[in-house]
Amino acid sequence: MKSLSMLIKPASSNCNLRCTYCFYYDICNNREIKSFGMMKLNLLETIVKRAFNEAEQNCTFAFQGGEPTLVGIDFYREFINFVKKYNTRNINVFYSIQTNGTTINEDWAKFFKENNFLVGISLDGTKEIHDKYRLDANKKGSFNKIMTNIKILNRYKVEYNILTVVNKNTSRHIDKIYKFFKKQDFRFLQFIPCLDPINDPRESHPYSLNPKDYETFLNKLFDLWFKDFLDGRFVSIRYFDDLLSILLGNNPKSCCMNGFCSCEFVIESDGSVYPCDFYVLDEYKIGYIEEKTFSELFNSNVTKNFIDSSLNHDVKCKNCNWYPLCRSGCRRNKEPNFPNGTNDNIFCESFKSFFEKNISKLTYVAKTLAYRQH
């Protein structure tokens, strides 16, 4: 494999927070074993060894959870030792970790900096907005702790971005959220739509994001972002970055904008492997990393069926003027009906409205960026 990326869950579904809308909590409650416990070091070594046996040019290790820091910092120190041991061909290696930010201290910050980790911090906005759903086991908010720890990251000059879940509440306060992020000088942002539990009817929870709210959110966020762009302050917002990449003839970074699913090689703490973080379910298990190579896992029938099923887009979808930008969106946003029944993305009308309103401005930004690069 020229490039190999994997998503490792060293603490399985274990987490020190109890976020109301957590999609992985829902996932683990829909499989036979909710938590596989903490990953053993011999399994971690196997993962690293297999990765460098197969990666030819680039290798990316992403850590998520649950809360991946719960496994302890020594686990990651050993991980770096394994990388040094097995990367005998000196291929390019990239590290990232997605954390709720509550456990970060000076040791973690120093480690991230020394080893060039890109850190994703989950933060939903101001204290009032964030603490509505991102609570600990005692139902207390996590905002204050996270903001304190972000200051530690800043002090060590750790590279990080902010990940915000767009739920009903955050979608209606994007002006306040964006203003707050701007005040904190957060320049790299991701906004991901909140997912309803996989077997529940759409929009059946207080936090559920409906298409109209998402449409309003996208339009307001774009207006704020575009104004900053005109004022000479470019903020990286993952979704807008991907749209600009497509307009400039490049590939988006987000898998949901490719028009088909890929295999993310999600590795749970027991070594079981799955094609996607949204489908770490028993029926989507590809196999075990201790028993199969990455190539064998990729060529399995489960992986093939998962990818092939994502290629079935409605004719009306393919004929839509905005298909080249939308590309049908994330498969998970077509549940619970996908792959049988309707194939509509729940946010189809949201995207249509957004593109119709903002395509000329998006094109202007793309052309401006292209001009600056020459």
UniProtKB/Swiss-Prot annotation:
State the InterPro entries in the record: 4Fe4S-binding_SPASM_dom (IPR023885), Aldolase_TIM (IPR013785), Anaerobic_Cys-type_sulfatase-m (IPR034485), rSAM (IPR007197), SPASM_anSME (IPR047207), Sulphatase_maturase_rSAM (IPR023867)
What range(s) does the Radical SAM core domain occupy?
1-227
Cofactor note from UniProt? Binds 3 [4Fe-4S] clusters. The first cluster is coordinated with 3 cysteines and an exchangeable S-adenosyl-L-methionine.
In which residues is [4Fe-4S] cluster 2 bound? 255, 261, 276, 330
Q: Does the keyword Isomerase apply?
A: no
Pfam families, A to Z: Fer4_12, Radical_SAM, SPASM
Q: What is its EC number?
A: 1.8.98.7
| Keywords for this protein | 4Fe-4S, Iron, Iron-sulfur, Metal-binding, Oxidoreductase, S-adenosyl-L-methionine
Which cofactors is this protein said to need? [4Fe-4S] cluster
Top enzyme class: oxidoreductase
Q: For S-adenosyl-L-methionine, which residues are the binding ones?
A: 21, 66, 122, 134, 195
The reply on keyword Transit peptide is no
Name the pathway it acts in: Protein modification; sulfatase oxidation
Question: Which residues take part in binding [4Fe-4S] cluster 1?
Answer: 15, 19, 22
Family of the protein in this entry: Belongs to the radical SAM superfamily. Anaerobic sulfatase-maturating enzyme family.
The free-text function statement in the UniProt record for this protein reads: Involved in 'Cys-type' sulfatase maturation under anaerobic conditions. Catalyzes the post-translational modification of cysteine into 3-oxoalanine (also known as C(alpha)-formylglycine (FGly)), by a free radical chemical mechanism initiated via the reductive cleavage of S-adenosyl-L-methionine (SAM).
Q: What is this protein called?
A: Cysteine-type anaerobic sulfatase-maturating enzyme
